[in-house]
């Protein structure tokens, strides 16, 4: 727009259309007087029906150093939101460079980043950043003076780009001073960094999100204390997952790449889920002890 008229050089407008459909199921059951349980299951899918670019776009910049021109998430009309778009990794070549699959079987491998939308490109959906199923499971138990509340949670079917591995796993000569990431998926022979399915991991998880155990003391009749309870609470007690990154939680909004420890302004993207950025930290485990006394 005319900066002289409006005071700025661009405007934002709604230029796309999405369609989200899904199902949610909530079930509760009282097993007996001492045990009640409930479970919530949800599943949904979002399709991009209209977009300002008819042929689509590839978004979510991998970032610096050296991979600013690498984008990872496909946004295309008629496709589901969240497809992580990448060449399919096969092996490390004799020179340390990655060898990719000839996905379309035409006898040549076209895996350059700027060729992602060509008719002969060898790119595919290496995963999707949106879970196909999410669950929450609550349990309340009591026996004698004891009570237990346990809440489990899980997400399944989603993938994450492990950007820690993408940057710090290949043994690149210019990064010899780095502490290389060394997961079970690492390939020591790989000495060149190029984004591919190698760095896309299934991130299914099941965790004990919250556990509270409490004991109510018997109080003698006539005591100046009318009640006393001792409790212990653990948040993020355990997580079961095969994901090697910091946190398998779905990353439904990409905050964008960052430089010098800071996010680059204006890069947050709701159309690019599935990126585990290097700024993310491990989830903490919190243990709390409590004593409640009533007079």
Placement of each model-derived feature along the sequence:
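Outer-membrane beta-barrel transmembrane strand signature
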Residues: 5-13, 70-149, 187-203, 207-210, ...
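Extracytoplasmic gating/loop element in the C-terminal half of outer-membrane beta-barrel translocons
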Residues: 60, 83, 94, 155-237, ...
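Membrane-embedded beta-strands that build the outer-membrane beta-barrel scaffold
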Residues: 23-31, 35-43, 135-141, 146-154, ...
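Structural signal for terminal/edge beta-strands and the immediately following C-terminal loop/tail
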Residues: 274-295
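Conserved small-residue
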Residues: 1-3, 13-16, 30-127, 235-245, ...
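Short, small/polar-rich motifs associated with maturation and membrane association
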Residues: 29, 117-118, 272, 282
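Membrane-spanning beta-strands of outer-membrane beta-barrel proteins
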Residues: 18-20, 132, 206, 284
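Contiguous, function-dense segments enriched for cysteine-driven chemistry
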Residues: 4-21, 26
């Amino acid at each position: 727009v005319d900066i002289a008229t409006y005071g700025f050089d661009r405007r934002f407008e709604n230029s796309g259309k999405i369609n989200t459909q899904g199902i949610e199921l909530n079930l509760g059951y009282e097993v007996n007087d001492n045990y009640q349980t409930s479970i919530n299951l949800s599943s949904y899918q979002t399709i991009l029906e209209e977009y300002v670019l008819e042929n689509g776009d590839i978004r979510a910049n991998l970032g610096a150093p050296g991979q600013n021109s690498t984008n990872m998430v496909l946004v295309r009309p008629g496709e589901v939101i969240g497809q992580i778009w990448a060449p399919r990794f096969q092996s490390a070549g004799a020179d340390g460079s990655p060898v990719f699959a000839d996905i379309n079987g035409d006898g040549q491998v076209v895996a350059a980043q700027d060729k992602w939308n060509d008719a002969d490109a060898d790119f595919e959906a290496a995963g999707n950043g949106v879970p196909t199923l999410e669950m929450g499971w609550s349990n309340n138990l009591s026996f004698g003076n004891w009570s237990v509340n346990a809440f489990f949670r899980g997400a399944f079917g989603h993938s994450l780009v492990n950007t820690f591995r993408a940057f710090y796993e290949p043994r690149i000569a210019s990064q010899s001073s780095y502490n290389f990431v060394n997961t079970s998926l690492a390939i020591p022979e790989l000495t060149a960094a190029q984004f591919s399915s190698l760095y896309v991991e299934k991130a299914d998880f099941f965790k004990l999100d919250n556990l509270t155990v409490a004991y109510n003391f018997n109080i003698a009749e006539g005591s100046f204390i009318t009640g006393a309870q001792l409790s212990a609470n653990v948040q993020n007690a355990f997580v079961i997952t095969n994901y090697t990154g910091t946190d398998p939680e779905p990353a439904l909004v990409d905050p964008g790449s960052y430089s010098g420890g800071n996010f680059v302004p204006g890069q947050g993207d709701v159309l690019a889920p599935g990126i585990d950025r290097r700024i993310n930290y491990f989830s903490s485990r919190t243990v709390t002890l409590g004593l409640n006394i009533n007079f």
